């Protein structure tokens, strides 16, 4: 697995698009009464508050060109590889890992 070489501008665009996609999904879930998740974004950090009081944090890491995901199950680092954000440990795709964590923490199936 070789990370795609990104310029700083490309990284900021791609990471920003991912945060916006997560926010749009949460907004849709709230509108459709799927699940009550609160998303709070401050710059490159997005904190999701889930039912039961648990949290998931997505954080951009510009110096490393990574996305970091912190869940109740642990932390993961993601690099952009061949058109997708991939876990640096096992190559899992970011949205899959986020969906798994959100489903576990919300107690219902959720897919970003």
Walk through the language-model features, giving the residues of each.
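N-terminal intrinsically disordered, cationic/polar leader segments
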Residues: 2-57, 61-112
